[in-house]
Amino acid sequence: MSASSPNLHKRFEPYAAGGVVALGLALLATPAIADLKLCNTTSSRIGVAIGYQDPTGWTTEGWWNVAAQTCETLYKGALSSRFYYIHAIDYDRGGEWAGKSVMCTADKSFTIRGVQDCIRRGYKGTGFFEVDTQEAKDWTIRLTDPSEGGAKPK
């Protein structure tokens, strides 16, 4: 080998470094996956409804049917609110995960704008529990069995 061989290697280092920088920038440009997910850690099938506030007001949506030991995405994309509200029903053993925040639901699949006057508008007034995402851009909720503080009998 000649004495100039090490210089040949050094001439290509900037190109290799540029490739690494370009790859890094491409990875940074890839959108991050950010969603609100719910995992059913119980042995039952459950039905789930969600409530949230966006710039146009309050919305409730349902029902997601979530099999035992699986997860579902309830809200796709970066979370726009700090607080989300959940109501879930245990289809197999009865009981529900509920709370004090009353929002509108329906028996069949629904998207309802607004949370006022549910019954007068032909919907049910249903108790939802609050989930504080602490302003994270994605969050996973885990519903557990009653023995672990999960669904309460109706």
Where are the language model's segments positioned?
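Bacterial N-terminal signal peptides that target proteins for export
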Residues: A3-G19
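Short, functionally important structural connectors and interaction interfaces within domains
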Residues: G19-V20, W58
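C-terminal segment of classical bacterial N-terminal signal peptides
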Residues: L23-P31
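Intrinsically disordered, low-complexity segments enriched in small/polar residues
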Residues: T30-C39, S43-G77, A88-K154
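Short, Lys/Arg- and Gly-enriched loop/turn segments at beta-strand edges
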Residues: S80-I86
